[in-house]
């Protein structure tokens, strides 16, 4: 089988062209839905801490929810700027900072790998980061995009690569010290799902035209059943992004709650035995499991996005094939 260099075939240039506006769009939409209740939770937790009555639940919620304060215990904390324009709170939060960091990492990595491929000859083999990136691109290209979308998958490959790398980095940044899991913010996961939703609908319109797109809402049934089928099909359009939103949000939030709960068991019971044989071992196990889940959830979101695009663009004679 002939090996295709996706970086030299133009996929990389389209990926980079999509990356910056995609990331800026994510940040902008999350700005517009900043979580004011999270600030109240942080203020309440701080008030309890001053009085010495901070509960385990307050600490867990403070670590899970988005706030305008980045904690660097025991060195202190950084209060992020609060910005209100025209009555809209677009304050910078720690989840936004995490998305900035992930965006910067992606841009640097893609630039370095792109420059590396520009200086390579056709006989040279990629090494190090370039080799890892090529393996990742080939995996998404063949096992995710091509297998689920089929013909015309190339035009959707840059988006799928971007969303996979972005979600993966956000998941992993939530596992490092002083980090925060932006994918544990339902505003972030909803925004990602909205991107997939609009790309899917636009792809369907291009593949079938307006007439074919509207005909799909009737599911090929007799006109007498349209009053039933059309609402069902419309609901079905929105259940897909809803499933993407909740799946990623719930999985990334649950793991952190479990880890924090296990750690607090030893403090609640005030037992070194519990800490040594329950809290620490199980927390380490869940933490390692979270690393696996970080990769798994990024893959699932990307694969489902490709599957939805494939189902939306498949012609009637190939729908069964796309579904498989």
Swiss-Prot record:
A Pfam family: ATP-synt_A
Cell compartments where the protein resides: Cell inner membrane
InterPro entries: ATP_synth_F0_asu (IPR000568), ATP_synth_F0_asu_AS (IPR023011), ATP_synth_F0_asu_bact/mt (IPR045083), F0_ATP_A_sf (IPR035908)
Main location group: membrane
Membrane-spanning ranges: 95-115, 157-177, 179-199, 224-244, 257-277, 291-311
Keywords assigned: ATP synthesis, Cell inner membrane, Cell membrane, CF(0), Hydrogen ion transport, Ion transport, Membrane, Signal, Transmembrane, Transmembrane helix, Transport
GO cellular component, as recorded: plasma membrane; proton-transporting ATP synthase complex
One example GO MF annotation: proton-transporting ATP synthase activity, rotational mechanism
Signal peptide from the UniProt entry: 1-33
Its job: Key component of the proton channel; it plays a direct role in the translocation of protons across the membrane.
Similarity section: Belongs to the ATPase A chain family.
HAMAP family for the chain: ATP_synth_a_bact (MF_01393)
NCBIfam families, per the entry: ATP_synt_6_or_A, PRK13419.1
Record-linked PANTHER family: ATP SYNTHASE SUBUNIT A
The protein, known as: ATP synthase subunit a 2
Species of provenance: Prosthecochloris aestuarii (strain DSM 271 / SK 413)
